[in-house]
């Protein structure tokens, strides 16, 4: 059956040629159904049992779980099927045509991260999955680039508890065992409009927001002073004010002001605790101006994540690669997989190419990635 799989480069080419863009804007958002169908067919050809799950709350998005073997434990290899949108004017190549040039494979999703599935399929064509002593699972998720709805849904509904998981995000084959989380909120202040010639007849939302920002800055300083994780290049939780808008004319009292902000918490900091800290920080403004200040989520929050540094997965991967695990500031689906089993983020390609025009993966990653997948499957599913 394995001989019916296309060659590695043709699998890669087909994945890149199948659009699967995730976007919050409905006009740009695409279903990943065609890509899931491709993957499901190939993993079926390798002897896997394949289950395709609709992801609730999405625009026709699906997860795919391919499994082989029986019993407890085993290994989960995971990745997302979607890409970010692309700026056609900044690409010098067709984003949906795999192009090889100067030892690089160009195309949307080559590094982040549809290409990872080509590596898995290519490595497993030499493995008789029916003879595994422990289960092997391949998970392809939806909407990582926007809501992470696929990973959230899978982690909330599955009964699987593998021994460990590897998410093949582009880390330049540097194993990642921890990263910060991400919380994005909108702070809205509702004032009362009026003519600027008589300020007492209105409530200026910009002035109230100025007061609120002062308290938010105090929270930023408090987070920096109270929480520390030395391994990160920025070893404290960050708080950023990213966007503000209010008012519509210089001679009107501003009736509404809106601030977009984010917090990137360290591993171990709970989302509920952070929401509580933000609400506590803004309480003086809310008490002074009842009913005029609200805080809401802009996007579903992502917690920080950490795999125990002494776990067998860390030890095995560090030995195979001859390098120590690291930590990063960006987010992945790892916090959701970590609720099921210890998880590392580890894959070919550079994060510096993710979300960039003319995205590419260097061909030097092909051989070591194929070898790594073969080795981890052998270690966790044959022993």
From Swiss-Prot:
GO terms for molecular function: acetylornithine deacetylase activity; zinc ion binding. PROSITE patterns: ARGE_DAPE_CPG2_1 (PS00758), ARGE_DAPE_CPG2_2 (PS00759). GO terms for cellular component: cytoplasm. Keywords: Amino-acid biosynthesis, Arginine biosynthesis, Cobalt, Cytoplasm, Hydrolase, Metal-binding, Zinc. Disulfide bonds: none annotated. It catalyses: N(2)-acetyl-L-ornithine + H2O = L-ornithine + acetate. Pathway: Amino-acid biosynthesis; L-arginine biosynthesis; L-ornithine from N(2)-acetyl-L-ornithine (linear): step 1/1. Its cofactor is Zn(2+); Co(2+); glutathione. One of its GO terms (biological process) is L-arginine biosynthetic process. The keyword Hydrolase applies. It is an enzyme of class 3 (hydrolase). It is found in: Cytoplasm. It holds the Pfam family Peptidase_M20. The keyword Amino-acid biosynthesis applies. InterPro entries: AcOrn-deacetyl, ArgE/DapE_CS, Bact_exopeptidase_dim_dom, Peptidase_M20, Peptidase_M20_dimer, Peptidase_M20A. Binds 2 Zn(2+) or Co(2+) ions per subunit. Zn(2+) 1 binds at residues 80, 112, 169. Homodimer. HAMAP family: ArgE. Belongs to the peptidase M20A family. ArgE subfamily. This is Acetylornithine deacetylase. The lineage of its organism: Bacteria, Pseudomonadati, Pseudomonadota, Gammaproteobacteria, Enterobacterales. The gene is argE.
């Amino acid at each position: 059956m394995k001989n019916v799989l296309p060659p590695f480069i043709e699998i890669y080419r087909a994945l890149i040629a199948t659009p699967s863009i995730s976007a919050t804007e409905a006009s740009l958002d695409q279903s990943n159904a065609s890509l899931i169908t491709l993957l499901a067919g190939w993993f079926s050809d390798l002897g896997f049992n394949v289950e395709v799950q609709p992801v609730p709350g999405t625009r026709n998005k699906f997860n795919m779980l391919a499994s082989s073997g029986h019993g407890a434990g085993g290994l989960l290899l995971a990745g997302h099927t979607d890409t970010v949108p692309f700026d056609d004017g900044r690409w010098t190549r067709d984003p949906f045509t795999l192009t090889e040039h100067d030892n690089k494979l160009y195309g949307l999703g080559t590094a982040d991260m549809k290409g990872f599935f080509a590596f898995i399929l290519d490595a497993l064509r030499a493995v008789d999955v029916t003879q595994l002593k422990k289960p092997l699972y391949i998970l392809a998720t939806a909407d990582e680039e926007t809501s992470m709805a696929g990973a959230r849904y899978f982690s909330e509904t599955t009964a699987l508890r593998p021994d460990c998981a590897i998410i093949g995000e582009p880390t330049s084959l540097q194993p990642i065992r921890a990263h910060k989380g991400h919380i994005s909120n909108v702070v809205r202040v509702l004032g009362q409009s009026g003519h600027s010639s008589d300020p007492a007849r209105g409530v200026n939302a910009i002035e109230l927001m100025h007061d609120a920002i002062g308290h938010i800055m105090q929270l930023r300083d408090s987070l920096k002073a109270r929480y520390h994780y030395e391994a990160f290049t920025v070893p404290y939780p960050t708080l950023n004010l990213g966007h503000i808008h209010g008012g519509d004319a210089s001679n009107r009292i501003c009736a509404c002001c809106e601030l977009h902000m984010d917090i990137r918490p360290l591993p171990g900091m709970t989302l509920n605790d952070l929401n509580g800290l933000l609400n506590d920080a803004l309480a003086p403004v809310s008490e002074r101006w009842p009913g005029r200040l609200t805080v809401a989520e802009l996007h579903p929050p992502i917690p920080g994540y950490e795999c125990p540094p002494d776990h067998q997965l860390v030890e095995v991967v560090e030995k195979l690669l001859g390098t120590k695990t690291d930590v990063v500031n960006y987010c992945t689906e790892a916090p959701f997989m970590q609720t099921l089993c210890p998880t590392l983020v580890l894959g070919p390609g550079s994060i510096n190419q993710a979300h960039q025009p003319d995205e590419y993966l260097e061909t030097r990653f092909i051989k070591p990635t194929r070898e790594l997948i073969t080795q981890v499957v052998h270690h966790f599913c044959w022993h």
